[in-house]
Amino acid sequence: MKTAARVDRDFALLFVVMLTIAGGNTALQSVLPALGRSLRVPDSAVAAAFSVSALLWVIAAPVWARRSARHGRRAMILLGMGGFCVSLLVCGIFLTAGINGWIGGTTAFVCFILGRLIYGSFGCAAPPAVQALVAGNTTRAERTKALTLLGSAFGLGTILGPTIAPFLVLGTIAGVEIGLAGPAFLFALFGLCVLIAVRQLLPNDLTPDTATHGAANAYPSIGGQSSGASIVAATESDTEQLAEQVAYRDPRIRPWLIAGLVSGHGQAMTGQAIGFLVIDRLNLAPAEALQPTGIVLMIGALAALLVQWGIIPNLDLRPRAMMLVGLAIAAVGCALTGLATSLYTIACAYALASVGFGFTRPAFTAGASLAVGHHAQGSVAGKVTSVNGAAFVLGPSIGVGLYEAQHALPYLVAGAAMMALFGYAWVRLRER
């Protein structure tokens, strides 16, 4: 029988696991534009590094979610944290080799992408197992609150990662310049500490309770705050026997999924290109861009979380109205970001766009959920999570590809797409 103190300790440790996986990824994302420029690799290669990682995450996450019940949740958490640490260590080693000129910049970045493949393949094993442990140790009445609090770790990670990344840049150690590779090494070290704590403190669940399981989480990325869909999927796990399977083409949810996919791509496009925009609009050297980039990303993440945690709960908005409001705000914010020329205007415009996306993400999640009955909630939640993840597979590469053609283009295209989607949503979105 677990004591209350033991339960609280285990929950705090699981919270740190989720926070670390999200924070480490977004910290690396925030420094990659500067790293790419310093290694003289194309901007599109930087985006590709995260696109392939996100693709593997989308593919592998459901597989690990199913296996967590058979192989033990603790084992899956250890696998996920191990993949996280190895990935960052590999990335740090090859980035350091490129920074010091031991290998060419292109070779360093190809090896860096291989490290990102490890993260996408194995890092996604931990979040479903964390959910399953929490779900298995709470009553149904307590579960939603506990999983929601756990899910907030991903949101906090999107703030903390870019915020602390500039302070993790290291100098020369033993004659080797670490520089911009510092965040990779330090997050790998922190992840190792978390892995050891999990191994020592979490109980070994060799005979897991198969009545509850976790659900695949969307790829933790800049701008990719949790939609809550994986929480719904996890809380519906004990009614699987009565579950109704819903197809992507089901007319009840298809308009909502389209709205989520298009708005998600807009968010991914603008978020991935923002580091390059800061460097070029402010005419900064790569190393000088870390702090202003971190400021812009932090303000954007705070704006989105303020909407999701503070504004939406106090407004009586239905999903359709929430989507329309969000699209209008996001369209204006994206266009202004593309035209901004100073740190202040970039930060304010990007924050405005983030406010808009802070409305659209939960709007499409809630709209799809309300479009079906109780027994279809788990199926719909899985599809919502897949759509969220899919946006971060192609979105970053599309955004940076447009940026290479013309710096304002990803923001103007995203703004135009949000306005077109506004028209579609006005006509097609219906609530049950």
For each predicted feature, which ranges?
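Cytoplasmic helix-loop-helix junction between adjacent transmembrane helices
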Residues: 115-154
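Intracellular juxtamembrane helix-capping segments at the cytosolic ends
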Residues: 125-138, 359-373
